[in-house]
């Protein structure tokens, strides 16, 4: 029996499914794939920003500091922190020289 033509019918005062092939491996595989698809769809819609940012930028956190002297790195960190600390509004304006 096809899944599209499956009908629930009242059987002895209960609702039951009149299909005998529910143990068919194809039906089991389709059910597992459907459940996995639903779980992945929900996770994608909950965490899409994190997921796509990870795939786009990898594990990097900010600009590369490779080849930059430690003093300049520390100065940049201080500027970033002071810009965040000094501003109470939602927008921060940072001018780079």
UniProtKB/Swiss-Prot annotation:
The gene is M. Keywords: Disulfide bond, Glycoprotein, Host cell membrane, Host membrane, Host-virus interaction, Hydrogen ion transport, Inhibition of host autophagy by virus, Ion channel, Ion transport, Lipoprotein, Membrane, Palmitate, Phosphoprotein, Signal-anchor, Transmembrane, Transmembrane helix, Transport, Viral ion channel, Virion. Pfam families: Flu_M2. One of its GO terms (molecular function) is monoatomic ion channel activity. Belongs to the influenza viruses matrix protein M2 family. The record marks 41 as: Seems to be involved in pH gating. This is Matrix protein 2. The M2 protein from most influenza A strains is inhibited by amantadine and rimantadine, resulting in viral uncoating incapacity. Emergence of amantadine-resistant variants is usually rapid.
